[in-house]
Amino acid sequence: MKHQETTSQQYNFSIIKHGDISTPQGFTAGGMHIGLRANKKDFGWIYSSSLASAAAVYTLNQFKAAPLIVTEDTLQKSKGKLQALVVNSANANSCTGQQGIDDARQTQTWVAQQLQIPSEHVAVASTGVIGEYLPMDKIKTGTEHIKDANFATPGAFNEAILTTDTCTKHIAVSLKIDGKTVTIGGSTKGSGMIHPNMATMLAFITTDASIESNTLHQLLKSSTDHTFNMITVDGDTSTNDMVLVMANHQVEHQILSQDHPQWETFVDAFNFVCTFLAKAIARDGEGATKLISVNVSGAKSISDARKIGKTIVSSNLVKSAIFGEDANFGRIITAIGYSGCEIDPNCTYVQLNQIPVVDKGMAVLFDEQAMSNTLTHENVTIDVQLGLGNAAATAYGCDLSYDYVRINASYRT
């Protein structure tokens, strides 16, 4: 499919229509059905034609899954270099002990043999049901088709990484660095068990920019803190979360670093990709009908702004009210109050879909019908001004519907 670019006056980069993980130069991606799921693609891969700088951030859940342990060790041994990644859905390879680690390493070996690259340049990821061993005969079948052009489509990769997701989530943008076109692409999955500190989510980002691994890791960590770590669907943190980025240096320009004159342009584009993917996860929360954005400003510290935003968007009472299209602002101020952060009710101001509901800690009369009309929209915004400082943050989440229970009551069946 031919990619088309659309440029917004707001950005110094272009959004590529139908852009994807394989849009940057030198990257290919694919996916196929190997039998882990009943009738959907469940095995995917990304390959770079040249060795790439790489970085990753992982779940903070102490029950870290085998693929994450192996990938983290691999990146340490390779000093931040990768050339391929393979991922399966339907099986998390988590809580599987030494056999799980051995299976992840065996997968690395099979992929490396097919691509004729060192196994230490292969990352592995899994998502799905916890506590079951990988069916390695099926995994091997998948690795044997990695070089098969019939399966080498980015759309297939996007589908292969899904679990309870209702849609694929991907994007690519382009920008100019030293007069040359650089592209950043991304693909993610995530729908349930989503909570700040990474969620049941896998996110993969590729770029043909020239940037070293240490710089890439610093950028990824910074971006993750205010994007992927600021989303929540249900308050659960998965054992398998990972965000991984590869930069294969295919575009020859001055190495990107904080000293590069166009560093901020690259950072803005990278953050845009991460924000887009994070919001796509929140929007696709299991059973969700609405995306909730909580903008907190006037906090004494960034940590307070982030914590209050996440507390509001994590509240089941707030989420239920938004689903019911009920302007129950009392649930919002209650969440602010129990967040554990420093607040002053007399300085607190709250808006729901740009309609004031609380001013200096006091309820504000509003037009119930006008408010009800705005709450039928797919995007709901809560603005909180604390009046205590200059720190601000935004958290993303979704409403809580009847379908969330239906989906999760039968996840293994």
From Swiss-Prot:
Taxonomic classification: Bacteria, Bacillati, Bacillota, Bacilli, Bacillales
Source organism of this protein record: Staphylococcus aureus (strain COL)
Stored InterPro entries: Arg_biosynth_ArgJ (IPR002813), ArgJ-like_dom_sf (IPR016117), ArgJ_beta_C (IPR042195)
Subunit structure: Heterotetramer of two alpha and two beta chains.
Pfam families registered for this protein in UniProt: ArgJ
Protein name (record): Arginine biosynthesis bifunctional protein ArgJ
UniProt GO cellular component terms: cytoplasm
Purpose of the protein: Catalyzes two activities which are involved in the cyclic version of arginine biosynthesis: the synthesis of N-acetylglutamate from glutamate and acetyl-CoA as the acetyl donor, and of ornithine by transacetylation between N(2)-acetylornithine and glutamate.
GO molecular-function term, one example from the UniProt record: L-glutamate N-acetyltransferase activity
